[in-house]
From Swiss-Prot:
Reactions catalysed according to its record: di-trans,octa-cis-undecaprenyl diphospho-N-acetyl-alpha-D-muramoyl-L-alanyl-D-glutamyl-meso-2,6-diaminopimeloyl-D-alanyl-D-alanine + UDP-N-acetyl-alpha-D-glucosamine = di-trans,octa-cis-undecaprenyl diphospho-[N-acetyl-alpha-D-glucosaminyl-(1->4)]-N-acetyl-alpha-D-muramoyl-L-alanyl-D-glutamyl-meso-2,6-diaminopimeloyl-D-alanyl-D-alanine + UDP + H(+)
Assigned keywords, A-Z: Cell cycle, Cell division, Cell inner membrane, Cell membrane, Cell shape, Cell wall biogenesis/degradation, Glycosyltransferase, Membrane, Peptidoglycan synthesis, Transferase
Location relative to the cell: Cell inner membrane
Protein's name according to its UniProt entry: UDP-N-acetylglucosamine--N-acetylmuramyl-(pentapeptide) pyrophosphoryl-undecaprenol N-acetylglucosamine transferase
PANTHER family with a match to the protein in the record: GLYCOSYLTRANSFERASE, UDP-N-ACETYLGLUCOSAMINE--N-ACETYLMURAMYL-(PENTAPEPTIDE) PYROPHOSPHORYL-UNDECAPRENOL N-ACETYLGLUCOSAMINE TRANSFERASE 1
Membrane topology label: Peripheral membrane protein
Name of encoding gene: murG
Keyword Transferase on entry: yes
Species of origin: Synechococcus sp. (strain CC9902)
EC category name: transferase
Biological processes, Gene Ontology terms: carbohydrate metabolic process; cell division; cell wall organization; lipid glycosylation; peptidoglycan biosynthetic process; regulation of cell shape
Entry-linked InterPro entries: GlcNAc_MurG (IPR006009), Glyco_trans_28_C (IPR007235), GlycoTrans_28_N (IPR004276)
C-alpha cells in the first residue's frame, strides 16, 4: 500500500482540503500527517491519522530573526527527511503554508515526489519559492496558474468536505418563516470588523422579515447584544453545508476554502475580503467569483456606511417585497457560483498522487 505524508497545518483553509483528499484516497493509501504543535490539526487529525509535529514558521523579518528562522527551517527539513526515510514514505502532499517548506525540501532531499496544492488566487510565498521543486503543482483558481514561477500548474479546484457535495436538510434550529434566509460567516480571522458591519444593518432587515443565521467566530465580544426571534447567533456550526445549500444569500470573507464551499453550494454571496490578508489575496479570490457574476464585493467599512446594507437590499429586495427590485439577480448569481465550482477536486488530486507513485 502507498505510504503518503500529508503536510497541512494551521487554518481550516489548509486543513479541510487536505482532509478531503485523504478521504478520496481512503483504502488506497496509508496516511501520516505532518503538522505544527498547538494548531488546529491537533484537534482534527489524531482521531483519524497519525500526527507528527515539527516546529515550522515563516521567513519574515531581517537580520538575526531571519537567521533563526532559516536554522529552524533547516532543522525541520532534516526532521522530515528522517521521517520520510523511517516511514518509507512514497509521496508527499501539501496544501501550502509554513509546514509546506520543510515538507517539500525533505521530499526533494529524499527523491520522493511532492504535490503542492495552492488554493488562493495569489499564491503564498512558499508556493512561489518552492513550487518549482515539486513533482506537480495544482491550483484552485485559474488565475493562480500564471503566478507560480518555474512550473506548469494544473487546475483542479479546491477540495471541500463531502457534506457540501451531498444534499443536506435545513437545520431545524434555523428561524422559521417565509422570509429570505441570510447566512453570515464571520470567519476565524478578522471576524469582528465584518460582524459589526452586519449588525448595523440587521435590525431593519429583521423587521422586514429576513431570517438570519450569524456564525460569528470565536473572538467576537458582541455576541448576544442583538436579540430577535428571526436571528440566531452562534460562534460555529457543524451544519454549514445545509445552511449554505438553503440560503438565499450569504455574507462571508473570501478565503479560498469558504469561497469553494459557497461555490459548490451555488450560494449567491456578498464577499467582504479580510483587509489584512497577505498580498491582499482575499481581494483576488473575491474577484474570481465577482467576474463570473456569482458574488458582489463589499470592502470592509465602518458600521455606519451604507454599502453593505444597499447591496443586501438590492439582492434580497424582491424577497422582501420591493417591487422595483430584480428577482432574477439571485438566480444569475447561483449560475455564476456554479460556473466557479469544481466538485471533483478531491478526486482529481487523488488521481494525480496515484499517477506519481505508480
Amino acid at each position: 500500500m502507498t505510504r503518503l505524508l500529508i503536510a497541512a497545518s494551521g487554518t481550516g483553509g489548509h486543513l479541510f482540503p487536505a482532509l478531503a483528499v485523504a478521504d478520496a484516497l481512503d483504502g488506497h493509501c496509508q496516511v501520516s500527517w505532518l503538522g505544527v504543535p498547538d494548531r488546529l490539526e491537533t484537534e482534527l487529525v489524531p482521531a483519524r491519522f497519525k500526527l507528527i509535529t515539527v516546529n515550522a514558521g515563516g521567513l519574515q523579518g531581517r537580520g538575526i530573526t531571519k537567521l533563526v528562522q532559516l536554522i529552524r527551517l533547516l532543522a525541520a527539513s532534516i526532521t522530515v527527511r528522517r521521517l520520510i526515510r523511517t516511514h518509507q514514505i512514497d509521496a508527499v502532499f501539501t496544501t501550502g503554508g509554513y509546514i509546506a517548506a520543510p515538507a517539500i525540501l525533505g521530499a526533494r532531499w529524499c527523491g520522493v515526489p511532492a504535490v503542492l496544492h495552492e488554493s488562493n488566487a495569489i499564491p503564498g510565498r512558499v508556493t512561489r519559492l518552492l513550487g518549482r521543486f515539486c513533482s506537480a503543482v495544482a491550483v484552485g483558481l485559474p488565475v493562480a496558474a500564471g503566478r507560480i514561477p518555474g512550473c506548469r500548474p494544473v487546475l483542479t479546484g479546491t477540495p471541500v468536505r463531502s457534506g457540501f457535495l451531498n444534499a443536506q436538510p435545513l437545520p431545524d434550529w434555523v428561524p422559521s418563516g417565509a422570509g429570505p434566509l441570510l447566512v453570515v460567516m464571520g470567519g476565524s480571522q478578522g471576524a469582528i470588523g465584518l460582524n459589526r458591519m452586519v449588525r448595523a444593518v440587521l435590525p431593519e432587515l429583521l423587521e422586514q422579515g429576513c431570517r438570519v443565521v450569524h456564525l460569528t467566530g470565536s473572538n467576537d465580544p458582541d455576541v448576544g447584544e442583538l436579540q430577535h426571534p428571526r436571528l440566531v447567533e452562534c460562534r460555529f456550526s457543524d451544519d454549514i453545508p445545509g445552511l449554505l445549500q438553503h440560503a438565499d444569500l450569504a455574507i462571508s470573507r473570501a478565503g479560498a476554502g469558504s469561497l469553494s464551499e459557497l461555490a459548490v453550494c451555488g450560494t449567491p454571496s456578498i464577499l467582504v475580503p479580510f483587509p489584512q490578508a497577505a498580498d491582499q489575496h482575499q481581494d483576488a479570490n473575491a474577484a474570481c467569483a465577482a467576474e463570473l457574476g456569482g458574488a458582489v464585493i463589499v470592502h470592509q467599512h465602518p458600521p455606519g456606511h451604507p454599502a453593505l446594507g444597499n447591496s443586501i437590499k438590492r439582492l434580497l429586495g424582491a424577497r422582501l417585497g420591493d417591487t422595483d427590485s430584480r428577482p432574477e439577480l439571485l438566480e444569475q448569481m447561483r449560475a455564476g457560483m456554479d460556473e466557479l465550482a469544481q466538485r471533483d477536486a478531491d478526486a482529481q488530486l487523488a488521481r494525480l498522487l496515484a499517477d506519481l507513485v505508480r
